[in-house]
């Protein structure tokens, strides 16, 4: 068998019911959820039952996605799958670092909770928006951004997908 990489997702991967089957089938995954619940009560139930509108609020999204990311990796590890490499996208980078042992114990989850609260507060104080632009070259998107005072390219995800962010009304006009 070749090398195995665990790739941890970021914000935007949330959905109602995420992680429930891991909780039901894997003691290692269940331990991750229980540890999360000890620091942030209700995290597990939020993953399993919260409507997508609640899960999409940053202060909820990030702890839940992180928890499911880590639970999935622990379940794979428990099943005998060894990661030769770990990587993550945005929030998933923190889960990858935690899984790799960079953060001791439950420190990664605490960090994610503080990060999520800070990001939520910043978003409430400075409302903005983001939009993914598909099927255009980066240079084309960058040129369009220059036509707006408060729209910037922020995430160069992959060829043909660039995320822009800025003032909400200007993002709406951009789209």
Stretches with model-predicted labels:
Residues 2-87, 164:
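Helix-rich "cap/lid" substructures immediately adjacent to catalytic or cofactor-binding pockets
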Residues 18, 58, 97, 130, ...:
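Generic anion/oxyanion-binding catalytic loop in active/binding sites
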Residues 18-20, 96, 100, 174:
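Ubiquitous "structural anchor" signal
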Residues 22, 36, 96, 144-145:
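Broad structural signal for hydrophobic residues in well-ordered alpha-helices, predominantly aliphatic
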Residues 62-132:
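Gly/Ser-rich oxyanion-binding loop with an adjacent helix/lid
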């Amino acid at each position: 068998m070749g090398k195995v990489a665990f790739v941890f997702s970021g914000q935007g991967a949330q959905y109602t019911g995420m992680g429930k089957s891991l909780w039901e089938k894997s003691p290692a995954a269940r331990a991750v959820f229980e540890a999360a619940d000890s620091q942030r009560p209700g995290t597990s139930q939020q993953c399993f039952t919260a409507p997508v509108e609640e899960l999409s609020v940053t202060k909820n999204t990030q702890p839940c996605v992180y928890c499911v990311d880590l639970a999935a990796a622990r379940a794979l590890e428990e099943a005998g799958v060894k990661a030769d490499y770990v990587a993550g996208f945005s929030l998933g980078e923190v889960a990858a670092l935690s899984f790799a042992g960079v953060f001791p114990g439950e420190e990664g989850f605490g960090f994610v909770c503080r990060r999520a609260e800070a990001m939520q507060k910043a978003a409430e104080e400075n409302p903005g928006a983001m939009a993914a632009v598909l099927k255009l070259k980066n240079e084309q998107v960058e040129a369009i951004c220059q036509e707006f005072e408060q729209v910037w390219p922020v995430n160069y995800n992959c060829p043909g997908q660039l995320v822009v962010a800025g003032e909400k009304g200007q993002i709406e006009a951009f789209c």
